[in-house]
Amino acid sequence: MGWLPLLLLLIWFSGAPGQRSPLNDFQVLRGTELQHLLHSVGPGPWQEDVANAEECAGLCGPLLDCRAFHYNLSSHGCQLLPWTQHSPHTRLQRSGRCDLFQKKNYVRTCIVDNGVEYRGTVAITVGGLPCQRWSHRFPNDHKFTPTLRNGLEENFCRNPDRDPGGPWCYTTDPAVRFQSCGIKSCREATCLWCNGEDYRGSVDSTESGRECQRWDLQHPHPHPFEPGFWTKIWTTTIAGIRTARSGPGAIPPTRRWRESSATYPAAVQRSEAQPSQEATTLNCFRGKGEGYRGTVNTTAAGVPCQRWDAQLPHQHRFAPEKYACKDLRENFCRNPDGSEAPWCFTSRPGMRMAFCYQIRRCTDDVRPEDCYHGAGELYRGSVSKTRKGIRCQNWSAETPHKPQFKHTSAPHTPLEENFCRNPDGDSHGPWCYTTDPGTPFDYCALRRCDDDQQPSILETAHQVLFDKCGKRVTRVDPLHSKLRVVGGQPGNSPWTVSLRNRQGQHFCGGSLVKEQWVLTARQCFSSCHMSLVGYEVWLGTLFQDPQPGEPDLQHIPMAKMVCGPSGSQLVLLKLERPVILNQRVALICLPPERYVVPPGTRCEIAGWGETKGTGDDTVLNIALLSVISNQECNVKHRGRVRESEMCTAGLLAPVGACEGDYGGPLACFTHDCWVLQGIIIPNRVCARPRWPAVFMRVSVFVDWIHKVMRLG
């Protein structure tokens, strides 16, 4: 073979499309359904047993009358849709069962190349003139006939003649026949700042023109980045390129994955000015903590952090001079790459990195607009929005939530308009039904008045009786257990559940308090409104990585998340369906309201988290701890422990909860039943010898738990 045919063959291969996925033409909204409000118009039927979303995209892609589809991750169902979110009479709604995929050309607000494939809904020219409908010949006659293929719908801007200036339209002004619509190129519509970690634009090709691989696919290039978990701009392309993690770009596949500078950057315009960023914080972190600028310099396990300007014991790419916008000073915890929380490389050679979960989360509540006394039962103000800023539903309304409290059912509390009230004496203050279909009720943008003295709950414990909860076949004998979670031993805790992300990886613990409800820690989730599609609860196994076919294993999708009252650090998870109770899966009892566990009570913690080398973290570990009073606990913690928290004694040996255990139970044995008295939350240092551990006190929030489960 001569050199010319060989050269042509190489050129042909270099321009080959590669393993292109049909999903590349779609944009996804996780945990979302698209509803059409007109009953006369219906979607396509559900097609079951579709292998995955790619197969569904392959069905929808070639069809001119298919513009989107729903994909049910649990049932592998696929439903084709003839409309998008920009179509008239449609509404997006949060969903716990499916994702919405829409063709990019129909939902982009910018154009690719000259915009021939643009199918958006802009209908006004750059000069502000309304567009003429393509089906009309007046005031400007033309030769174009609308079809499904050319997309000449209504009076939307289009580019049927491939004009280099982009989409245009005939105008309704007889004096101006046609005009450009001035729709920006996707390369210019959104620019990037710093290293592009906050970029959320629509560019899906590299600077050299190669198309990017989808983040939710693992082919042709496998990668560790989970959509919604790692929200990055890094471009993984399909044309023989791997990703590079220093700004948007990619590196050739002949080089192994490594942290290096980009050689094929994404086609995005860089900005010299910093965009409006989330405010920096010093003592807490918001979201994923990218704006945290405090001075914590140890991990949640108490391991000192490695300096960012050092390459020992761990080599890395985060040189402070390359990431000046990330404030990588000394060895302070930071989040330069958009992980789920601030983190650092550790000073231990055997532990590369760890999260700094001991840094508390900032509250995301809106500013209170008024105050109340006591529990707010006598509050008669006019505040009508929740602590998250959601408008309250009128008490007389039947939608979106059917109220249990009306004028007739609460004669002593005037339920006027949509004002915040407390008709049921909720101990956490005035509340309301909300106008958000996914949030039945929430507490209001109110605070306790400064001159109001909250009654103490630290009083004598009263009698507790339980029936069918908190039972297990075998339990650790508190008298004969050997303290070896850190310092724990393998054991059975049938109400302890494992929370799993989309990849099936354990990330937190939880407690089964009802057949369809799990209580866990707020620290386990980046937001109270994040999509739970693909997230599951695993029950009925002692193993962090159970074998396929394990008979008692149950894995149930999470359907809904409800964040607890302000300051609670709690989250209730509603499951897609009830669990099946058996010897391996049992409910744990909830304590009476405001119950205080007597000092000296023996309790246990359970989890699959970090053991710091003291045990087997592949199985469920249990450790025994003894409750101490808040007064004794505050001697060590310098008065920082609140009444809504409780403590266990520090032991000589390192015994306690660490990363991966958060959200799990502190269960105390009372009257022959195990009772959920505390929830594991990050402490300043986990399992520190002679140092009391702090837990959220469940009894303070048990009325909220019952209320959420009752209202669904």
Curated annotation (Swiss-Prot):
Domain Peptidase S1 residues, every copy: 485-710
What coarse category fits the chief subcellular location reported for this protein?
secreted
PROSITE patterns with a match to the protein in the record: KRINGLE_1, KRINGLE_2, PAN, TRYPSIN_DOM
Keywords recorded for this protein, A-Z: Disulfide bond, Glycoprotein, Kringle, Repeat, Secreted, Serine protease homolog, Signal
Please give an example of a GO cellular component term from this record.
extracellular space
| Coiled-coil parts of chain | none
Q: Which organism is it from?
A: Bos taurus
Give the family from UniProt. Answer: Belongs to the peptidase S1 family. Plasminogen subfamily.
Residues in Kringle domain copies: 109-186, 190-268, 283-362, 370-449
Disulfide connectivity? C56-C78, C60-C66, C110-C186, C131-C169, C157-C181, C284-C362, C305-C344, C333-C356, C371-C449, C392-C432, C420-C444, C469-C589, C508-C524, C603-C668, C633-C647, C658-C686
Q: Which InterPro entries match?
A: HGF/MST1, Kringle, Kringle-like, Kringle_CS, Kringle_sf, Pan_app, Peptidase_S1_PA, Peptidase_S1_PA_chymotrypsin
In terms of PANTHER family, this protein maps to: HEPATOCYTE GROWTH FACTOR-LIKE PROTEIN-RELATED, PLASMINOGEN-RELATED
**What post-translational modification does the entry describe?**
Cleaved after Arg-484, probably by HPN/Hepsin, to yield the active form consisting of two disulfide-linked chains.
Domain PAN: start-end pairs: 21-105
Tell me where the signal peptide lies: 1-18
Q: Which residues are glycosylated?
A: N72, N297, N394
What's the protein here called?
Answer: Hepatocyte growth factor-like protein
Subcellular location, record wording: Secreted
